[in-house]
Amino acid sequence: MQLKYKKGYLRNGFSSTAVSFKGKDTLASSWCAVKTINDAIHGQFRIDGVREHLLSTPEMNKLSHIKQLGLAHLVFPGAHHTRFEHSLGVSHVAEMMAESLGLDGLEKDTVGVAALLHDVGHGPYSHTLEHILHERGGLDHMSITEGIILGDYDVLREGEESSVPERKSVPEILENHGIDPKEVAGLIRGPDAKGSERNLLSWTEGRTNFVENDKTKAHLIHGPVDCDQIDYLLRDSHFTGVKHGIIDHRRLIMCLESHGGDISVEEGGLPALEGMLVARGLMYSAVYFHRVTRVTEVMLSRAVERSEGYIPDSFDLQRRVDAEIWQVLHEAGDFSRDMIRRLKYRQLLKVCLSRRKQDLSEEDIRLLTELASDSKKRMDLEDEIARRAGLEPGYVAIDVPNIKLLLSEPRMSQVDIRIIGDDGKTRWFREHTPLAEALRKRQVSQAVFYVMTIPGFEGKVSQISEDILFT
């Protein structure tokens, strides 16, 4: 087979090499461009074939305008990285994992594509507004991602088509490269309906299959140890400056094995696995659920909640990027405009009341869980507290952060993974270390709820909230 190379530079700044294959052509086109990515986390790596074609789609390029950590840059000044670079990194890690697991060529392409596309369903500010999409539309970003991959959801808004001439859809590109869109969508969703890991509850020894169908590829994309988590821990740690997320990912990947229909870890990789799971818990406490990060997210979400009628419906909202939703909210009324300005100039709400789980009765927990799942009841209670404190509606906010964890990171409770011993038998991670049980029980956020208000009203709002909620 002869190869011809044509070097050039892409408009997005990636260096590119086009490769022409003479001989049997298995691709949609005889020309296959190779992009060399210079990444802050993984260094230099290449993207080619179907993944290179996907990089030119609106679905992928939209992610360049959505911050990975939402408003966390107001707490961690370096956290301006985007979903786009994260997706590139996840695809690279998936390639490394696929190589270690011994997957064949088509399997590598399939998991590489699933990794690259795993976040295309995200809307503005990533997880910050996801609960609104879930409440109003019954969907999450993974459902939107599935729709994009299967051709059931278009990220372009009305009138934008003319700016993207000769566009090919995601499923069309996949099919042209011999990849099944349904398989890709299934890998991203996870092995069960909600990405849960039901098959991990079984246990056996040796090489008997753990599950009826091989879940190796599915868990590479969405499982207790997957390419998404490895990249976001490393990337978010780097850009926030919080070192808890630094993990020995190369050692961990080297010790992965497809064993009995699932991903297992060789015993020599146990310290690296322990390090990753501990890092995940610490990063959620120190970064993702940092108290001030939560304040900024609550301020933005309340601005959206109280602008219904002025902003797009939940499905159209997902088509926007960060800057667009900011502009929409600025024009959506006095309250939303004030929240946006407060975020712009970092004049944030203040936490005036919080509680740890051990300080709450069963009745208290029931009430807070109800408030977290019923936004109307929560808003009515917030407005009653505000009224008694002499504030306008919206200037008191109640936040139950652990409920948000169910939408943003359903894998947090998945800490049990099979370890392959030198005798060839598999044993649970929990049989090797007490860390498994400790991590499963560990609370991400020490406070299970917060009450926030504008500066100067903390004492009054705290007392009124205490009286209403706990007496």
Q: Model-flagged regions — what are they?
A:
Residues 2-66, 74-113, 121-355:
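Sequence-structural signature of the catalytic-core scaffold of metal-dependent phosphohydrolases
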Residues 9, 301, 311-471:
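Terminal helices and disordered tails flanking the catalytic cores of nucleotide-processing hydrolases
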